Amino acid sequence: MWTQPGGYVLIGEGYWKRKAPSDYLAVLGGNEQEYFDHRGNVQAGIDAGLVPMHAVVASDDEWDEYEWKYARSIERFVREQPDDPDAVTMLDRIRRWRDGYLRWGRDTLGFGAYLFYRPGIRTT
């Protein structure tokens, strides 16, 4: 278990807002079973014997901020390190990722933070 009895666990996890298109799954390099929906994330904690205390999801604006900063950092790195042997691969990957986010990701995948309590008496 991740924490002692009487302790808390804070988990950040993606969740499906809707059924993921197969083209988006290909961009992610994954499958539908990698994530639950928001309720499923809470239920997974309950199934692990934890008590949900709070949950919050990122807004579209917050998700955009994260994705654009991620893409921008890779673009900047490649621009500043053009001789890096992985530069072309990195640039290709981030541009496919960004296109996938704009086509499908923003409406399909969300991000939540989940606070759980582990029942029991703390021993330390």
Residue ranges and their predicted role:
Residues 54-124:
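Conserved Class I S-adenosyl-L-methionine
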Residues 11-32:
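Short, glycine-/aromatic-enriched active-site segment of Class I SAM-dependent methyltransferases
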Residues 9, 38-39, 109:
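Short gly/pro-enriched beta-turn/loop segments at secondary-structure junctions
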Residues 6, 33-38, 77-82:
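Glycine-rich loops and low-complexity Gly/Arg-rich segments
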Residues 1-8:
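A short glycine-rich, Lys/Arg-flanked "PGG" loop and its adjoining helix->strand segment in the class I
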Residues 33-55:
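Short alpha-helix
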